[in-house]
């Protein structure tokens, strides 16, 4: 069969790569064409566009990028027509994917959605498009099943592939000393920084994270470098230790060996919890006051992180938008480090 898969960010690339492995296990002759990233390409996808060329976030950024978005939509539709796949598979990224789903469905292609759109959080009206244009919907979050069923739409829970991905990378049981030696790092405890996978996220989060360094001198701060983001981009926010701070392609080991992490709210927060490292989740979108005001109107859930949503209570502290301040971040980080008053509670509830 011929498969056309569309993912628009780093987490989608990870899920897409695992999906391709599963497809090939059941269909060894599968042909896969995709929008995604390095991981999908490494697993045999013929890549049309890398997500680093298509990712847009924040209301202001979307407005500025309307021309690019229209161009990519046109390219994607034409590429599907030229490739003529047996099925089009969408991975999250609903702003783009639901527009393509409309085109695909109207032109007779089967449409599957893997990693269901998080319409329980915002833009619930998208259920209309999902019902109209998506043939089969798959979820990796158990609580989504009841949500979609409440709208009389069938959804299949398929488990969370992050567990397999984490186990595969951590099963070698590497010790802290080995990790430090492999990365030429000093023998100091670690605070891990995961500022996101997009430039806008990194720009909004990393400078504040790095301001903490002088206040925790006994620690080394390590930054998880996102695929597709150049070292030059990170270095503009870093000090003279820049050559030692970036960790490439080894996020899970970094998180495992860290005493605590500061994490951009998203897939990384769930991964950090599954690994078992205490964390503070942070986020700040672009667009200033307007973006925050609009966000408050459209977001319908009490928490932003999947960790808290799955448990339906606050397990990890979320510092979002106006709450993402230096004073609060310093306080919450101190509270989850060894001997901190919140550390034991987080570890007990993971």
Question: PLM features: what roles do these ranges have?
Answer:
Residues 1-350:
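Nucleotide-activated sugar donor-binding and catalytic core shared by glycosyltransferases
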């Amino acid at each position: 069969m011929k498969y056309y898969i569309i993912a628009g960010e780093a987490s989608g690339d990870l899920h897409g790569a695992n999906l391709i492995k599963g497809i090939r296990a059941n269909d060894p002759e599968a042909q896969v064409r995709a929008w995604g990233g390095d991981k999908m390409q490494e697993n045999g996808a013929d890549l049309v566009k890398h997500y680093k060329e298509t990712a847009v976030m924040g209301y202001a950024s979307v407005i500025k990028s309307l021309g690019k978005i229209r161009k990519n939509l046109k390219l994607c539709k034409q590429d599907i027509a030229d490739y003529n796949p047996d099925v089009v598979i969408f991975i999250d990224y609903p702003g783009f994917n639901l527009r393509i789903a409309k085109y695909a469905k109207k032109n007779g292609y089967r449409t599957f959605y893997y990693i269901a759109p998080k319409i329980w959080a915002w833009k619930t009206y998208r259920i209309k498009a999902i019902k109209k244009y998506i043939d089969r919907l798959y979820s990796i979050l158990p609580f989504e099943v009841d949500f979609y069923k409440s709208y009389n739409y069938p959804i299949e829970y398929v488990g969370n592939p992050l567990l397999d991905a984490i186990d595969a990378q951590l099963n070698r049981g590497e010790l802290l000393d080995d990790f430090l030696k492999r990365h030429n790092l000093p023998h100091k405890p670690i605070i891990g920084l995961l500022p996101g996978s997009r430039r806008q996220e990194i720009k909004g989060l990393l400078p504040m994270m790095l301001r903490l360094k002088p206040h925790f001198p006994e620690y080394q701060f390590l930054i998880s470098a996102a695929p597709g983001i150049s070292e030059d981009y990170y270095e503009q926010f870093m000090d003279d230790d820049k050559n030692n701070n970036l960790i490439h392609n080894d996020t899970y080991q970094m998180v495992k060996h860290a005493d605590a992490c500061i994490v951009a709210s998203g897939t990384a927060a769930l991964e950090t919890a599954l690994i078992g490292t205490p964390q503070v989740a942070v986020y700040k979108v672009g667009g200033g006051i307007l973006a925050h005001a609009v966000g408050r109107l459209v977001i319908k859930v009490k928490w932003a992180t999947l960790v808290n949503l799955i448990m339906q209570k606050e397990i990890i502290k979320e510092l979002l938008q106006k709450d993402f301040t230096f004073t609060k971040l310093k306080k919450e980080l101190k509270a989850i480090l060894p001997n901190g008053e919140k550390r034991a509670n987080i570890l007990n509830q993971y």
